[in-house]
């Protein structure tokens, strides 16, 4: 997004989206998306990948936007690996209020994980519904 486009969006009272009007800490960018460290990080290196086009749902991204986001996820992982050396990752998207979406502009979380950051990591993203998190193999 050019600085001219950013300024136009800042002046547009009909588009109050913080990802459109005031992206902070941008680390990587491509034609269709950018990445930045999460302002409310849950672990060291927690980042988000955000499409430049304002769209609320991951399921409404174009195929090209999905590819652009996935490319940045991989690039951002390399940056996080070099700086923080995590032991694993969770990648996730909240879509809709029932899933906890609070900003209605798609953003894909890249959450580095570290040995011992939780007592029992089994189930990973399944912990979004705590009673269903643990399972037997």
Predicted segment positions?
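HIT superfamily nucleotide-processing domains
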Residues: 1-137
């Amino acid at each position: 997004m050019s600085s001219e486009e950013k300024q136009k969006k800042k002046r547009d009272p009909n588009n109050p989206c913080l990802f459109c009007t005031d992206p902070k800490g941008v680390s990587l960018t491509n034609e269709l998306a950018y990445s930045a460290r999460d302002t409310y990080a849950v672990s060291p290196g927690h980042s988000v990948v955000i499409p430049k086009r304002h769209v609320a749902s991951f399921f409404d991204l174009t195929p090209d936007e999905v590819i652009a986001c996935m490319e940045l996820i991989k690039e951002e992982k390399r940056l996080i690996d070099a700086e923080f050396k995590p032991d694993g990752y969770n990648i996730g998207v909240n879509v809709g209020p029932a899933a906890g979406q609070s900003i209605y502009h798609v953003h894909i979380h890249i959450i580095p994980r570290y040995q011992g950051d939780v007592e029992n990591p089994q189930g990973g993203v399944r912990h979004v519904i705590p009673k269903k998190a643990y399972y037997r193999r």
